Amino acid sequence: MSGLIRCRQGAFYIDGKNVKQQKLSDYVYFVMQEADHQLYTDSVTEELRLGNKRIPSIDEKVSQILKMLHLENFKDCHPYALSGGQKQRLTIGAAMLSEKPIIVLDEPTSGLDWDNMCAVANAVNYMREAGKLVFIITHDLEFISLTASRALLLKEGIIKDDLQMTEQNNFKIVKNFMVEEGGE
């Protein structure tokens, strides 16, 4: 979906327009599970400003995101001095500032404690409210229940179930997940 792997068949449509695979990166921001592959600058603040300096009131937005993701005390630190979870939240912060309409998050809560998982959930909801389409690849059911409006359950790359997130379907999702993981 983000264009990293060549698709052999099918077409991509965004806002009703056919988009060539080579142009997907113009529309999609992909946050990798391994954050080290997406960090390029010498400070947390500069990482968030990278490519976004023309955004009006960028400094104010950077401060807001640092606070939202519990990174304000690390704003001057080198990204490689951060813990894995802090790096993960930093790359999500960069996605928040991106002007791309589609965000893909790969396992955005792996290794996070409850407070930081909730901070990432707030960031996802912030992006959704800003009009971004957010795809989340995860095994974290608590996180999905806090962020998703729809869940696609996949097995071996095939959609097994497509559910609107409601209290009734939350139970079905948990049950399906437990059955699949438990091997019933």
Feature map (PLM): residue ranges:
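Conserved ABC ATPase "signature" region
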Residues: 57-74
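A short, surface-exposed alpha-helical micro-motif characterized by mixed small hydrophobic
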Residues: 144-146
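H-loop/switch region of ABC-family ATPase nucleotide-binding domains
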Residues: 138-139
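Conserved beta-strand-loop-alpha-helix hinge in the C-terminal portion
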Residues: 158-181
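Conserved ABC ATPase signature
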Residues: 78-82
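Conserved ABC transporter NBD signature motif
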Residues: 10-24
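Catalytic Walker B motif of ABC-type/P-loop ATPase nucleotide-binding domains
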Residues: 103-106
